Amino acid sequence: MLISTRVRKSPYWHLSMEAGCWRATVYNRIYHPRGYVKPEDGGAMVEYEAIKNHVTMWNVAVERQIQVKGPDAEAFVDYVITRDATKISPMRARYVILCNQYGGVLNDPILLRISQDEFWFSLSDSDIGLYLQGVNHDNRFNCLLYTSPSPRD
């Protein structure tokens, strides 16, 4: 596999390679392992059966994290997702959908509620952070939105 020095590797890249990863795509400027079984050995169908019937390893370090924190965090999150955020207990995660004003799906992240006034979206490669900043500003929510590959920096 050809590896570029201009694309980052996740902290788990070496584990993916040890597990037999033979192909990857670039996702959020990070290598994302995409294939463990070569086509001549059954390829995608073998991997599909493993997902369906066994346990598989997924390196999701390529996903972005967006923190929503502040006194209006719950109201803000409840406004932007299709699920009732008030029913998510602290330290529980849920699969959620974010839609635009016409009902089109913008993203389908995992949402983790840390505390009463703090949530974390774990999302794929979209500009949802910009969308959330716009909603926060236009509707005058009192929230801080923070996104970074290393949120504690």
What are these regions (language model features)?
Residues M1-S148:
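Glycine/proline-enriched, intrinsically flexible loops and inter-domain linkers
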